[in-house]
């Protein structure tokens, strides 16, 4: 009944992944992002992660893998997903949803920390504001985007972009793969210090 559609979905997902892998620069950017985060941790910094919708869930997943564990037992790493419901509702009500992440960065971000922002379009105003706040605080910025990078293109220290122009879910599928690779590389890099 749906077998052809199921196969077509999997083939499209595979094609998006293959296109991403075929650009050697993407592989280098993943390594660069992992080293940037690891170096922040080694110097006493932390990661603040943020996103909207499914990307919000990915931001939370990234932070919990850092504070908890990915594959191996090891010390927790300092990471916070900007996801506190009371903060989000307060700032949304009092200032506007476009400031929910930037207000948090202003409050707890420090020089040497890393902002990890996810936006499949690259146009999320609240992520753009968070990037601006992070730069003001002397933080480094890693952006995970899609399509042509949108307004976030060129703003981050490291931008990992999935150049897919149809649906956001295909971009998110690559984002979660990248997140898992980042976790693995961060664990490798931090183990050198132990």
UniProtKB/Swiss-Prot annotation:
Cell location: Cytoplasm
Enzyme Commission designation: 5.3.1.28
Protein's recorded name: Phosphoheptose isomerase
GO biological process terms held by the UniProt record: carbohydrate metabolic process; D-glycero-D-manno-heptose 7-phosphate biosynthetic process
Alphabetical UniProt keywords: Carbohydrate metabolism, Cytoplasm, Isomerase, Metal-binding, Zinc
Domain SIS stretches: 37-194
Organism: Haemophilus influenzae (strain 86-028NP)
Keyword Lipid metabolism: no
């Amino acid at each position: 009944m749906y077998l052809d559609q199921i196969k077509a979905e999997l083939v499209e997902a595979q094609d998006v992944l293959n296109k991403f892998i075929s650009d050697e620069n993407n592989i280098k950017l993943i390594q660069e992002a992992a080293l940037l985060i690891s170096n922040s941790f080694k110097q006493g910094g932390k990661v603040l992660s943020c996103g909207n919708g499914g990307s919000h869930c990915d931001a939370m997943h990234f932070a919990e893998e850092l504070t908890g564990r990915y594959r191996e037992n090891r010390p927790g790493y300092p990471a916070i997903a900007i996801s506190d419901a009371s903060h989000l509702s307060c700032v949304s009500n009092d200032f506007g949803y476009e400031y929910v992440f930037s207000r948090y960065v202003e409050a707890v971000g420090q020089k040497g920390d890393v902002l990890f922002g996810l936006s499949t379009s690259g146009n999320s105003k609240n992520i753009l504001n968070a990037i601006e706040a992070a730069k003001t605080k002397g933080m480094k910025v890693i952006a995970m985007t899609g399509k042509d990078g949108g307004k976030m293109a060129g703003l981050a220290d490291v931008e990992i972009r999935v150049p897919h122009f149809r649906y956001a879910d295909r971009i998110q599928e690559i984002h979660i793969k990248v997140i898992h690779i980042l976790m693995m590389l961060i664990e490798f890099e931090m183990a050198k210090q132990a």
